[in-house]
A protein has these predicted regions:
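Membrane-interface helix/loop boundary segments of multi-pass membrane proteins
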Residues: 136-162, 201-205
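Short, Lys/Arg-enriched N-terminal segments with co-localized hydrophobic residues
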Residues: 1-17
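Membrane-interface capping segments at transmembrane-helix boundaries
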Residues: 76-81, 247-260
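Interfacial transmembrane-helix boundary/kink motif in multi-pass membrane proteins
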Residues: 19-32, 53-63, 75-107, 150-157
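Alpha-helical transmembrane segments in multi-pass membrane proteins
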Residues: 22-74, 124-125, 129, 233-240
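Hydrophobic alpha-helical transmembrane segments
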Residues: 26-27, 96-99, 124-127, 155-160, ...
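Functionally important transmembrane alpha-helices
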Residues: 182-238
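Juxtamembrane helix-entry segments on the extracytoplasmic side of multipass membrane proteins
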Residues: 115-127, 174-188, 228-229
């Protein structure tokens, strides 16, 4: 797919210089993403914002990041296919089992029901918010970070992007999540990152990644919180499904790239 791999070699950068360039781009990408994620959480905390207003403010900050990033790449490349904004590879949906495991995991958040007490505005606001998160995280972790490391090896691209994806969820501490809950979420996020990275590499398109990522967060945000026991059981089930799916996806890679 045109533009899928960052063309560092095409502009005369090779060897150690190319690796340093990748590290530099990765650091800058993480810094920009974390800056905006920190900002959206800090604004809410410093202003004691709650409810619908806080969701919309956080969504606005992240959408600003998404729009700014898209504008930057359009001006630089006049094409967003370099970020994976293109049609998925033919038959890639079949190779990733039509994303069914990820859809099942997302819907499983509704085991205790959907929080409808806060009204349609709450659900709509969370849709806007989670869509922003889906775009931002997939653009940066898959479209930028995973993409620039993939020409070295699939394994390195998956591990680097997934590790940073998991670390990024430390920001949830700023959002009020407990330490134990955040640690568990980081472990889950690492495995989830591996799966989404493999989906991205197999399909060479970011659209499906954004869709399933948004669906997962949206279902989680509007679901009713269960008991601790229920959450543990659900977490274990989701983890097992993800692990099996990751193994399955690794076998769908081209033979010369099965190093994950």
């Amino acid at each position: 797919m045109r533009g899928f791999i960052f063309p560092l070699r095409q502009i005369g950068i090779g060897g150690s210089k190319m690796k340093k360039s990748k590290v530099f781009i990765t650091v800058i990408a993480m810094a920009v993403l974390l800056l905006f994620f920190f900002a959206q959480g800090a604004i809410v905390m410093m202003t004691n914002m709650e409810g619908l207003k806080s969701i919309l403010v956080r969504a606005t900050v992240i959408w600003l990041l998404v729009i700014a990033t898209i504008v930057f790449y359009l001006k630089r490349n006049r094409d967003l296919s370099i970020l994976g904004f293109c049609k998925p590879m033919e038959k890639s949906s079949k190779r990733v089992f039509f994303y069914i495991p990820l859809i099942v995991i997302a819907i499983s958040h509704f085991m205790c029901g959907i929080d409808t007490n806060k009204g349609a505005s709450f659900i709509f606001a969370n849709l806007i918010f989670t869509l922003a998160i889906g775009f931002a995280e997939e653009i940066y972790f898959r479209g930028i970070i995973c993409r620039i490391w993939i020409d070295e090896s699939v394994k390195k691209a998956v591990v680097v992007s997934s590790t940073l994806f998991a670390i990024c969820h430390l920001m949830n501490v700023m959002g009020g999540a407990g330490i134990a809950e955040t640690i568990l979420q980081i472990c889950f996020a690492f495995l989830y990152g591996i799966v989404i990275s493999l989906v991205f590499i197999i399909g060479k398109s970011i659209w499906s990644c954004i869709a399933v990522h948004t669906l997962h967060d949206f279902c989680s945000f509007i679901s009713i919180d269960g008991s601790l026991q229920m959450n543990v059981i659900l977490g274990v089930i989701q983890f097992v499904i993800l692990l099996c799916y990751a193994i399955y996806l690794s076998k769908q890679l081209p033979y010369d790239n099965q190093d994950v």
